[in-house]
Each structure stands twice: as C-alpha cells, then as structure tokens.
Amino acid sequence: MGRVVLGGGEMAHYGKESKLSPAKVLEKAVEFFGPGGVGLEVKEKGGGCASFEGGGGHVFIEVCEKGKGADVDLETREWDYQVKQFMNKI
C-alpha cells in the first residue's frame, strides 16, 4: 500500500491476494463500486481490469490470475475508505 502525488491530486495504490477468481473479483468490483453499490459510473470493464469514476475521484482495479485465486491491484483518488472496505470483502 502506498500513496503518490501526481498532477496535484493524491492517489493511493493498494494490493491484495484473493482466493476468488479474477472474473469473480471484477464481478464483485462492479457490484460494490458501480451504480448498484457506491454509485460510481463504470467507465471500463474487460481484459482483467475495470475503472470507475464519480464524486471527483476514481477507482481502477487490475486483476491477474495467481494460482487458484487472483492478484488484485487497486488505484484510487477520493475513494480510499471504500477501496479498503472492498479489499476486506474479497
């Protein structure tokens, strides 16, 4: 986990290993961050990643297969609390 400042905005980066498959992690990400969850707009989904925007910030998630689970990388601006909640769910 770490923070980096780019272009005047502070972004946080998080990583986690999950026992869920990459497809299931992305499905849960859309449920959690999308219109039926936190309410962010789904900007992109596919190819092992998804991005969400809204409220002056964003969430980007990239998922790679790792053994029987997934290696999950998240980047966010303004949605740190929600990203931490999501990481606890996967």
Range-by-range predicted roles:
Residues A12, V38, G46-G48, G57-V59:
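Residue-level marker for the onset of beta-strands and adjacent loop->beta junctions
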Residues G15, S51-E53:
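Mature extracytoplasmic or otherwise solvent-exposed domains
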Residues E44-C49, K68:
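Ser/Thr- and Asn-enriched, surface-exposed coil loops between beta-strands
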Residues E53-I90:
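Beta-strand/loop substructures that line and gate deep hydrophobic ligand-binding cavities in soluble
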Residues G2-V42:
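Terminal, regulation- and interaction-focused segments at domain boundaries
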Residues V38-K43, F52, E62-V63:
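Short, exposed beta-strand/loop patches in secreted or surface proteins that constitute
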